Regions:
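Short proline/glycine-enriched turn/loop segments at secondary-structure junctions
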Residues: 180-181, 225-228
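Outer-membrane beta-barrel "beta-signal"
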Residues: 229-243
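Detector for outer-membrane/organellar transmembrane beta-barrel domains
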Residues: 55, 61-190
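Surface-exposed coil loops of outer-membrane beta-barrel proteins
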Residues: 1-60, 128-140
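Short loop/turn motifs that connect adjacent beta-strands in outer-membrane beta-barrel proteins
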Residues: 28-29, 161-162, 197-203
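C-terminal closing repeat unit and adjoining cap/tail of repeat-based domains
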Residues: 190-214, 228
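Low-complexity, intrinsically disordered Gly/Pro/Thr-rich segments
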Residues: 218-226
Length: 243
């Protein structure tokens, strides 16, 4: 896994409700995947929504992985049919995300690289989104937050006798689908270290920094923008134990 991809991609489907998934047998290094959700979030989705109807957010995806020797590659395409009763999404086109990635294990460590193109996605997903990328009109409570763009991330894991050193660096360029002057460029990097205390217990630490350069709406219903440059940093320390 690549540390930091959620911070620079435009769509992450990590957890979904009501999913049917299929994984094909691996043949000549290729493994195919497919999944579908008739209601991606039954607890926090739109009220009065009905599963497998246009009132809910529906999702589908296809993926393929190729693994042979030191090389592993993946490709996925994901589709989102947004709810037609949520004010923010009822007029939006279907969302799409195409992701390509891979890693290669060298003698010194493993190198990771991944990229994603996304279009008509509802909100940028990263938890450290300091300033929402949105357009607000006075006449409507709805916020236009449909975004498009692309992101890249590269990572490195270097194993040593004392543990693993981890590094990642990524960027994202995004804009509102209907208001291209409202946009954001992000650069994010992180370093980490994990040390196995035993076969079941691992201690880990990491530090990261994220910088945004954004053109945001200066006032509700205004077409004027103002440049803001928020940033965030964090340090974590933790321990995991497998039972």
């Amino acid at each position: 896994h690549i540390a930091g991809y959620k911070n620079v991609f435009g769509f992450n489907s990590g957890r979904l409700d009501n999913v049917v998934a299929y994984k094909a047998p691996t043949v000549d290094g290729f493994t195919f995947y497919a999944q579908y959700s008739g209601n991606t979030d039954q607890y926090q989705g739109p009220e009065d929504a009905v599963e497998n109807k246009a009132s809910v957010d529906r999702y589908g995806s296809l993926g393929v992985k190729f693994a042979r020797g030191a090389l592993t590659t993946i490709a996925t395409i994901e589709w989102s049919d947004w709810s037609n009763i949520r004010a923010d999404t009822k007029h939006a086109d279907d969302g799409i995300a195409v992701t390509l990635g891979g890693n290669y294990k060298f003698d010194f460590g493993t190198v990771y690289l991944a990229g994603q193109y996304f279009d008509n996605q509802w909100k940028l997903p990263s938890p450290s989104e300091i300033v929402p990328l949105q357009f607000v009109a006075n006449a409507s409570p709805a916020k236009d937050r449909m975004v498009k763009g692309y992101g890249f991330v590269t990572g490195l894991k270097v194993p040593t006798a004392q543990g693993d050193f981890l590094f990642s660096l990524g960027m994202r360029d995004a804009q509102l689908v209907n208001h291209s002057n409202i946009n954001a460029m992000r650069v994010s990097g992180s370093v980490g270290y994990r040390y196995p205390l035993s076969q079941r217990t691992v201690i880990y630490t990491a530090a990261s920094y994220t910088h945004d350069s954004m053109n945001k709406q200066s006032a509700a219903s205004s077409s004027d923008t103002v440049k803001v440059k928020p940033n965030a940093s964090q340090v974590v320390l933790g321990l995991t134990h497998a039972f």
